[in-house]
């Protein structure tokens, strides 16, 4: 049965159509707002995936170029691999819904959101998140939602829900928040150094609107929702569980009774092997269940030690940060480099400077975007002591790179101040938690080593949460390591300067967190960030005054935009000739700004002089060194600048009478000439008289 539902949110109408499209999907809707529309479908497999010990949930956001009235470029004319924006949107959909499936539910669940029509004032990402929540809610999937999602801007001191294009361009905050009616589930934000209180208020402001969205989705579910399947939850046999816990509790406590990670890993494998061997005869096929029981037992003991005894796996207090050391200038041939180490997490970041032409133009279904600052994050398998095949970056690497890029963006100098494209690459060479935040710290150091005049240094710190649902006790942990992230309930990354927050990313494994936890976590993160910044400044406290000798020097000046065509020349002939002659790289913007890049200052200056001569208006009386390009019976044609020629009449070639032009000049000669007349049709008359001494026949 076809149904249409509408909802007013912040002055816009959201429309959902059900029962009309994709009827074989578990739950399918067309959700639209303004001219933006997405088809969102959710489907759940009937059986659990064999051998799975995790929720096999996949969320895919697809951009179709027809949504913006475009035809894909290239020979194939078909959409290719997902764009970075599409991958980040897929992650946004996944993160708030994943914790709301039952533990032990191993059926495949797939959510596909396809952007079918877009306008610039309504971004499809938040609409896709709400669409996924609705599709899952009306499907048979055992989804403990719904959730709602909004974006929040901060424009002229006011919070704005789902800001339009113009508001986004002026906003100090770009926040996406998702949650249930009771709690916040996910936060993703980039900001221009806003305070912790401003960020908290923005999150809570957004949550008030989320509550309205959730109530609306519940009415849709009540009217058209399918009956939920009874999930088959795989749990180990209770008798086996009791026996393993009794046998292994003391062993697991011993396993965790060391602050050394490597020793703990050795003990973990030893306890696992001993326990499986002990029950091998009684439970010959029970290895997987025994492993699961041991994992849960370790998690229980570890969380109890942290919450009730204040002991973390490596012996730190709840607010203590791991030992930090850093260096800069570690790679001599690069433009800037740094290594940042925090505990067993180590990241090398390399900065490369280029011309604006080296920036990235992104032409997707939204507005065409140009990026002159790019950050890439790589995490090879050796960083965790594993052996795996190398491949293209995965969703996690792309997400971490985008987070670090967002964290540094507010402090990158304006292109008028620093006319360079900047690429940062963070190589994780050792990983034990918080690698994305270490890449932010390493990026700050590498930028300063490269001589980039950043507005302020940026550091990042990852916060964790352990919550005991039975008692309500919580522990908020500063600078979490891998085990605490794996066993904990929250991964809350906060990056910023001394003045404020520049980026946030929060993922929750439980059913949301409240205002009290958010407030404490933000303040604890601020204190941790300031401590880390102090340590970083001991390595390098200001950007280097000079660029690397291997970095290009960029000469910037402006010309009349009407003269750009003259500089470029027919088919690029003029500008390519300048590049070939001087060896420089030239970029010209539509507004007339010219950027000349070269490691040779003299070559850059020569190219500038050539361009100055090209764009300079020729006037009567000018004396110019020109090149003879053609010999005519009546005189010589002289190129005064690319694309501009004049004629020296035979009677004006010399201070005395000339019988033949060839007697005085030849093609290719460079001669001084004076402009004596510029005719209405643009033709230029020249003379050599008065510029040369008496000449004889050649």
Residue ranges of predicted features:
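Extended amphipathic alpha-helical scaffolds
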Residues: 1-30, 34-45, 229-367, 552-566, ...
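Alpha/propeptide regions of enzymes that mature by internal proteolysis
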Residues: 2-5, 9-12, 26, 37, ...
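Glycine-rich, flexible beta-strand/loop modules in the N-terminal catalytic cores of phosphate-handling
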Residues: 13, 25-110, 115-122, 181, ...
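Conserved phosphate/anionic-ligand binding catalytic regions in large, soluble enzymes, centered on
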Residues: 27-29, 122-140, 328-351, 432-452, ...
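Flexible, glycine/charged-enriched surface loops at secondary-structure junctions
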Residues: 103-109, 144-146, 213-231, 262-263, ...
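Mobile "lid/hinge" segments at catalytic clefts and subdomain interfaces of large enzymes
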Residues: 140-256, 447-545
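Long, charged amphipathic helices and adjacent flexible linkers at domain junctions
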Residues: 227-238, 531-557, 605-625
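Single-stranded RNA-binding regions, centering on S1/OB-family and related RNA-binding modules
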Residues: 550-554, 561-698
């Amino acid at each position: 049965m076809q149904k249409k539902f509408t909802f007013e949110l912040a002055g816009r109408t959201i429309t959902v159509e059900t029962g009309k499209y994709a009827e074989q999907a578990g739950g399918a809707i067309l959700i639209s707002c303004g001219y933006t529309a997405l088809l969102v479908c959710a489907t759940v497999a009937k059986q659990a995936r064999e051998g799975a010990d995790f929720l096999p949930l996949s969320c895919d956001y697809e951009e179709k170029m027809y949504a913006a009235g475009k035809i894909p470029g290239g020979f194939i004319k078909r959409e290719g691999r997902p764009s970075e924006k599409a991958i980040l949107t897929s992650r946004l959909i996944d993160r708030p819904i994943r914790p709301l499936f039952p533990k032990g539910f191993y059926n495949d669940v797939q959510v596909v959101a396809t952007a079918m029509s877009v306008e610039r004032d309504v971004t499809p990402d938040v609409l896709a998140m709400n669409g996924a929540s609705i599709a899952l809610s009306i499907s048979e999937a055992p989804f403990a939602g719904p959730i709602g999602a909004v974006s929040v801007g901060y424009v002229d001191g006011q919070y704005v829900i789902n800001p339009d294009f113009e508001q986004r361009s002026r906003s100090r905050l770009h926040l996406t928040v998702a949650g249930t009616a009771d709690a916040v589930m996910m936060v993703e934000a980039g900001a221009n150094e806003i305070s912790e209180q401003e960020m908290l208020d923005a999150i809570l402001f957004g949550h008030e609107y989320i509550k309205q969205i959730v109530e609306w989705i519940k009415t849709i579910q009540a009217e058209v929702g399918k009956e939920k399947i009874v999930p088959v939850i795989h749990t180990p046999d209770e008798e086996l569980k009791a026996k393993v816990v009794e046998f292994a509790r003391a062993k697991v406590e011993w396993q965790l009774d060391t602050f050394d990670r490597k020793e703990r890993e050795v003990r973990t494998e030893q306890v696992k092997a001993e326990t499986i061997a002990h029950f091998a005869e009684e439970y010959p096929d029970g290895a997987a269940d025994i492993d699961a029981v041991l994992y849960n037992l370790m998690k229980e003991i570890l969380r109890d030690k942290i919450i009730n005894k204040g002991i973390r796996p490596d012996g730190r207090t709840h607010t203590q940060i791991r030992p930090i050391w850093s260096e800069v200038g570690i790679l001599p041939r690069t433009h800037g480099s740094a290594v940042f180490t925090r505990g067993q997490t180590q990241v090398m970041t390399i900065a490369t400077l280029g011309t604006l032409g080296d920036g990235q133009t992104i032409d997707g279904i939204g507005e065409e975007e140009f990026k002159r600052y790019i950050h890439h994050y790589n995490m090879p398998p050796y960083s965790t002591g594993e052996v795996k095949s190398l491949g293209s970056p995965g969703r996690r690497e792309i997400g971490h790179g985008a987070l670090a890029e967002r964290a540094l963006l507010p402090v990158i100098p304006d292109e008028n101040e620093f006319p360079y494209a900047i690429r940062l690459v963070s190589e994780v060479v050792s990983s034990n938690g918080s690698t994305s935040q270490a890449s932010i710290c390493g990026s700050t150091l590498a930028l300063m080593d490269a001589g980039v005049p950043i507005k302020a240094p940026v550091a990042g710190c990852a916060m964790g949460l352990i919550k005991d649902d039975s008692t309500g006790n919580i522990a908020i942990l500063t600078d979490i390591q891998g085990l605490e992230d794996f066993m904990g309930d929250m991964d809350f990354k906060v990056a910023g300067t001394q003045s404020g927050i520049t980026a946030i990313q929060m993922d929750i494994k439980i059913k949301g967190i409240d205002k009290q936890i958010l407030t404490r976590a933000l303040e604890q993160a601020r204190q941790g960030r300031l401590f880390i910044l102090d340590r970083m400044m001991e390595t390098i406290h200001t950007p280097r005054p000079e660029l690397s000798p291997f970095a290009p020097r960029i000469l910037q000046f402006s010309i009349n935009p009407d003269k750009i065509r003259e500089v470029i020349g027919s088919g690029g002939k003029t500008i390519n000739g300048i590049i070939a002659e001087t060896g420089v790289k030239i970029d010209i913007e539509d507004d007339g700004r010219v950027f000349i890049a070269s490691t040779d200052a003299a070559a850059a200056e020569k190219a500038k002089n050539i361009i100055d001569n090209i764009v300079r208006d020729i006037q009567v009386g000018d004396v110019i060194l020109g090149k003879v390009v053609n010999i005519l019976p009546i005189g010589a044609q002289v190129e005064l600048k690319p694309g501009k020629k004049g004629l020296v009449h035979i009677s004006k070639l010399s201070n005395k009478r000339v019988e033949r032009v060839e007697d005085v000049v030849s093609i290719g000669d460079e001669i001084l000439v004076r402009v004596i007349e510029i005719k209405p049709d643009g033709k230029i008359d020249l003379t050599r008289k008065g510029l040369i001494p008496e000449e004889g026949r050649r």
